[in-house]
Amino acid sequence: MDELTSQALTAFTTRYCDAWHEKHNSWPLSEELYGVPSPCIISSTSDAVYWQPQPFEGEANVNAVESAFDIVIQSAVHAFYTTQFAGDMYAQFADEKLTLLQTWSADDFRRVQENLIGHLVTQKRLKLPPTLFIATLENELEVISVCNLSGEVCKETLGTRNRTVLAASLAEFLTQLKPLL
């Protein structure tokens, strides 16, 4: 596993939870994840859950994605999706406001791998270099992804070659994120 990415993700998650504690005097709250089982859930309200990050359980890899395409996935992507279970977190990188995607449970991890495979299928069909998404943006046609060839983090427009490099590595990207509440 890519230790730098794992440490950077854990550090950002701590910054996010600390900012939430400071502003709301509680763990993060999510309405979107209400009713979805997870080891992260601390307590529930009538329409939301309070969550706390938990260590990832299971095989710490995205081998299902590798097997589907007979490719080697950047070790940083393995680390990103298998360091922890947590809720999605809102963040800012430079001028970009984003939702950092996380796996909520073992079931969610399987779903994420299926979505990554679907993303790669589309890219292969369009003859685009392979990327693996890690965050969404307000514009649904754009995502933040890791280029599987270079390891760079890019803002990309789905289905096109439009990509802007944001950081040389996933660890560098995560280190520069600022929590948004």
UniProtKB/Swiss-Prot annotation:
Database matches in InterPro entries: Syd, Syd_sf
Q: Where in the cell is it found?
A: Cell inner membrane
Q: Which domain of life is it from?
A: Bacteria
Keywords on record: Cell inner membrane, Cell membrane, Membrane
The answer to whether keyword Membrane applies is yes
User: What is the topology of this protein in the membrane according to its UniProt annotation?
Assistant: Peripheral membrane protein
Pfam families, A to Z = Syd
Write out the GO cellular component annotations.
Answer: cytoplasmic side of plasma membrane
Q: What does this protein do?
A: Interacts with the SecY protein in vivo. May bind preferentially to an uncomplexed state of SecY, thus functioning either as a chelating agent for excess SecY in the cell or as a regulatory factor that negatively controls the translocase function.
Q: Matching NCBIfam families, A to Z?
A: PRK04968.1
**Would you identify the family this protein belongs to, as annotated?**
Belongs to the Syd family.
The name this protein carries in UniProt is Protein Syd
What is the phylogenetic placement of the source species in the record?
Answer: Bacteria, Pseudomonadati, Pseudomonadota, Gammaproteobacteria, Enterobacterales
